[in-house]
Regions:
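Structural signature of the two symmetry-related core transmembrane helices
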Residues: 89-103, 299-313
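Cytoplasmic helix-loop-helix junction between adjacent transmembrane helices
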Residues: 117-156
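Residue-level signature of mid-helix packing/kink "hotspots" within the transmembrane helices
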Residues: 40, 68-76, 161, 278-282, ...
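Helix-to-loop junctions at the C-terminal end of transmembrane segments
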Residues: 74-86, 285-296, 380-381
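Interfacial helix-cap and linker-helix signal at transmembrane-aqueous boundaries
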Residues: 49-50, 81-82, 169-174, 260-261, ...
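Helix-loop-helix hairpin linking two adjacent transmembrane segments in secondary transporters
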Residues: 152-202
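Juxtamembrane intracellular "pre-TM" segments in multi-pass secondary transporters
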Residues: 8-19, 205-238
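Extracytoplasmic gate region of multi-pass secondary transporters
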Residues: 42-43, 233-282
Length: 415
């Protein structure tokens, strides 16, 4: 046996620190998997609730707004609560709150009860992104955190595919309420995992938890050297583009299931259809990232939005068997644009105000994503689901002229 194997030298603290970092990454990735999966699970539930409660399209949009609104509005307060009471406690409490909401969905006998539970679930889901990303930045160096955050993001995409498809599979043999009980059981196990893996002595005050996707999406880039009026116009255009892009995603995912149901798809088939879109979305981040390096930001965004518009428009008129063929490409185009837009926020903001710029960008984007399903829902009640999806497809094309200020800014800087 080596004489140094048991010596209390510096290797022991380093190994302990690495072990703790791995536990933190494992715990936060597990939380991301559950929270993102449980969030996108609602797209399957909306179609079920529409039949059970006899909801209109506007009411479905309202349910989506309640969850997304609660989740987006409470992210910054969640960071403050984490700093005050401890990130570990708040993250566990949020996970438990979301789990309890899922567990009680099946007991709802009225729409009001369901709406209250949806708000509770949204509040619980709000804590995961800011606090998990804060944990990772505390326990990993700048270079290591990029890899760790990529791993963390990957598990979020896994959750979006696995949990909705699990619900869909369970619907073949049990009721949706019973299926949610099994998913809630997984949520309780995730909470237990957070209790066992996350460190008790995390000092949140030493870190700055950022809202939602800001920490794990923000690239380390320098701002473009451009005149301030040009920067403002370009950044304003970028915020509007992000808002329309997010509204397109939420609108499509909320109302496409109803189009498929009208053409003969069962609740189980709709769940698997959404899973295919989420799988395509995971690949979309990679595909659009590669495109942006080869074609540039402007051409990549224009191409992805035109493709999104064409696919959504095609689905509005296509029979069910053709819609199935378009689901994966839709996911690629629908989810890929956002990864390109995130990289432009840092470039089009002032060097000392990038954190504020991300806060403005995500507030506009998430706010529009929460509000537009209600507007689309009211349109659906008047025009029908098919015409609503046509409206969604046409609205995407409004992004194209908004790219002009951004192109002017990048050309001025010589990029």
């Amino acid at each position: 046996m080596s004489l140094t194997s048991g010596s209390p030298d510096n290797t022991h603290p380093v190994s302990v620190e690495k072990s703790q970092s791995r536990k933190v990454l494992g715990a936060t990735s597990l939380a991301h998997l559950f929270h993102d999966g449980a969030t996108d699970l609602h797209y399957v539930l909306f179609a079920i609730w529409q039949q059970q409660f006899g909801l209109s399209m506007a009411q479905i949009g309202l349910l989506k707004m309640l969850f997304s609104g609660a989740m987006s509005a409470f992210q910054i307060p969640a960071g403050e609560l984490g700093r005050k009471y401890g990130e570990r406690k708040v993250l566990m409490a949020g996970t438990l709150l979301l789990t309890v909401a899922l567990l009680l969905y099946g007991t709802s006998s009225t729409l009001i009860q369901l709406m209250v539970l949806i708000v509770i679930g949204g509040l619980g889901a709000s804590v995961q992104h800011p606090l998990s990303s804060s944990f990772i930045t505390q326990y990993y160096s700048a270079k290591q955190s990029r890899i760790a955050l990529s791993t963390y993001n990957f598990f979020g995409d896994v959750g979006k595919g696995v949990i909705p498809s699990t619900l869909s599979a369970c619907l073949l043999i049990i009721s949706w309420g019973s299926a949610l009980q099994w998913i809630a059981l997984f949520g309780f196990l995730v909470t237990l995992g957070l209790y066992l893996l996350l460190p008790v002595g995390s000092k949140a005050a030493q870190a700055k938890p950022l809202a939602a996707k800001e920490t794990h999406s923000q690239p380390h880039q320098q701002a473009l050297n451009i005149p301030e009026p040009l920067r403002r116009r370009a950044f304003s255009a970028l915020c509007v583009i992000g808002s329309i892009d997010n509204a397109t995603r939420t609108g499509t995912l909320t109302f496409l299931p109803f189009l498929m149901a009208a053409r003969g798809a069962s609740a189980t088939q709709i769940g698997f259809a959404l899973t295919l879109i989420f799988i395509g979305g995971a690949f979309g981040k990679l595909v659009c990232g590669i495109l942006s390096t080869r074609l540039g930001i402007i051409k990549s965004v224009a191409a992805s939005e035109i493709i999104t518009s064409a696919i959504v428009l095609g689905m509005a008129f296509a029979p069910l068997h053709v819609i199935w063929l378009l689901l994966l490409p839709l996911g690629v185009a629908l989810n890929g644009t956002s990864s390109i837009l995130y990289g432009s926020v840092a470039e089009l903001s002032r060097p000392q105000q990038q954190t504020r710029a991300f806060a403005i960008f995500y507030t506009a984007s998430l706010g529009c994503g929460a509000l537009m399903p209600v507007i689309y829902g009211m349109a659906g009640d008047v025009m029908g689901v098919q015409q609503t999806l046509i409206l969604v497809a046409l609205l995407v094309l409004c992004i194209l002229p908004l790219l002009i200020p951004i192109r002017s800014a990048t050309r001025y800087s010589g990029q």
